[in-house]
């Protein structure tokens, strides 16, 4: 675990851009993939997230995930679609090593969606948790809090 997750005196960690949706970072030193989707969280974007996750899960061992909803301008996902998404993710992830997924939102609606997903994933290998504070999420993920600010300039893919 980092000495002090709130300590931002160290240089920013090195990240790489991953193929897939925009605003996607990989932090190999922390075994972390972070995504900061912009725009509208709707059924289509939720499906895109699911497809992308299936692709990366087939390509490599599970990594910790951090999804930052702070750049969303609107949340328009149907509740029934969130239930279906959680059911599919449980089926797709069956038998795979457990993974931590931190969902951050400073907006109450986004946080509510994250909490609902957290409750739907209880008892599955996907350990999803909703957060309104990045430092608390960093402690739970065992990464420096500076990483979760997503302010570094990622290195392009090779």
Predicted region positions:
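Amphipathic, Lys/Arg-enriched alpha-helical "gate/interface" segment within cytosolic domains
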Residues: 2-158
């Amino acid at each position: 675990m980092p000495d002090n997750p709130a300590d931002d005196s160290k240089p920013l960690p090195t990240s790489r851009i991953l193929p897939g949706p925009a605003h996607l970072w990989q932090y190999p030193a922390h075994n972390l993939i972070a995504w900061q989707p912009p725009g509208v969280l709707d059924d289509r974007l939720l499906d895109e997230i699911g497809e992308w996750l299936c692709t990366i899960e087939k390509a490599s061992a599970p990594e910790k995930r951090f999804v930052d909803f702070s750049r969303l301008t609107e949340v328009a996902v149907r509740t029934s679609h969130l239930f279906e998404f959680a059911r599919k993710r449980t089926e797709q992830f069956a038998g795979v090593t457990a993974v931590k997924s931190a969902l951050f939102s400073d907006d109450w609606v986004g946080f509510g969606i994250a909490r609902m997903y957290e409750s739907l994933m209880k008892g599955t290998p996907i350990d999803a948790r909703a957060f309104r504070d990045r430092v608390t999420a960093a402690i739970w993920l065992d990464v420096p809090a500076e990483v979760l600010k997503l302010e570094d300039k990622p290195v392009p893919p090779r």
